[in-house]
From Swiss-Prot:
GO MF: NADH dehydrogenase (ubiquinone) activity
Protein name (record): NADH-ubiquinone oxidoreductase chain 1
Family to which this protein belongs: Belongs to the complex I subunit 1 family.
Subcellular location: Mitochondrion inner membrane
E.C. code: 7.1.1.2
Entry GO CC: mitochondrial inner membrane
Transmembrane intervals: 2-22, 69-89, 103-123, 138-158, 172-192, 224-244
Record keyword Ion transport present: no
Organism: Paramecium tetraurelia
Gene encoding the protein: ND1
Amino acid sequence: MLIYSIVLMLVVTLIIASITLLERKLLSLVQRRVGPNFVGYKGRLQYLADALKLFLKGVAIPSGANSFFFVAMPSLAGAVCYTFWMNSIWGPSLSMFDVEYNIVYASLLSILFGLCVMLTGYFSKNKYSVMAGLRAAILMLNLEIFLGIVFLNVCFLVESFSFAAFAVYQEIFWLIFLFFFLLSNILLVFLLEVNRTPFDLAEAESELVTGYTTEYGGFYFALFYLGEYFHLFFFSCLISVVFFGSWELLKPFLFLHNYTV
């Protein structure tokens, strides 16, 4: 179980790092600029250089901040993000544990991450961080209500909150054909949830103050930075599980469960 946990964390971290590089490449293409092109072949190892810089950078704790909670909040947020992937979203066997109420479990973890964001701004003792933390937390919690109502309707149709039930229900007919217009609204809400353009309300690229992470740097800033991309990747997987046939398309790769604990 310990080995599987370590492998899972490494695989997810590498996927998230690749997503960060892909997003930067796409943004540079849209904005007609070069983008990352120095480290590795055409900049493909840029995420390794960024990670090395962040992990070797020192951490300064503000004099008025609570040192314990200042360090604990990003650590808790990082733990919440990794806990997402211990659920059975990979497949029936490729998970550390399986719970009957997978959708509820994911929603609770998402709400907990929003609380971490709010408390992060509060314990920084910076008025800009406090305002940004409240703004981000209120936005995330309000969106969770909408997502909860939407997924509740879908779960009533499937008569279960389990990812396995969604896989069985969609063996013949995908739910995307029933909830196409609803999915378009969900995608807009997900953009709001993960603070992606044009809904980057909690933190805009044009602002000098980086929201609730204003006082953070180095390793602790990297945890929040990865947390946003964890949400982005997890919500993408969640949409695939709920609307696009679950893990039925991954059946050729399910032989890997023989090599897991």
